[in-house]
């Protein structure tokens, strides 16, 4: 059943890449901040209290797994959450949770 969900939402290699990207607390915080809407790099820097090179590194990781979309406006980059990608990832995680429930129920009936 899980393999069906993986094909519907995203490839397992993509899920793995996203999990790796989310394994850092700074990147988790960035995702959280972007759930409120597009943010300029300057706004993220101010809220997170990190350096510009550190932010650039984290944004590159999030862009590489397509969780974040970047666009230039003047001298600053503006970032937004790729909501379709985020929804697909969440759908995969929820499918695991649902599968665990089904397995848990069937174990008791054996």
Regions found by a protein language model. Name each.
Residues 3-5, 15-16, 51-53, 61-63:
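Short secondary-structure boundary micro-motifs
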Residues 5-9, 34, 64:
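Compositionally biased, intrinsically disordered low-complexity segments
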Residues 13-54, 73, 77-85:
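N-terminal helix-turn-helix DNA-binding core of bacterial DNA-binding proteins
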């Amino acid at each position: 059943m899980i393999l069906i969900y993986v094909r519907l939402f995203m490839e397992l290699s993509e899920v793995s890449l996203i999990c790796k990207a989310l394994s850092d607390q700074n990147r988790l915080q960035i995702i959280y901040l972007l759930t409120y809407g597009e943010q300029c790099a300057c706004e993220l820097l101010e809220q997170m209290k990190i350096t510009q090179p550190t932010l650039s590194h984290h944004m590159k990781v999030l862009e590489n797994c397509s969780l974040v979309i970047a666009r230039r406006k003047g001298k600053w980059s503006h970032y937004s959450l790729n909501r379709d990608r985020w929804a697909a990832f969440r759908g995969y995680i929820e499918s695991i949770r649902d599968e665990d429930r089904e397995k848990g129920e069937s174990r008791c009936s054996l």
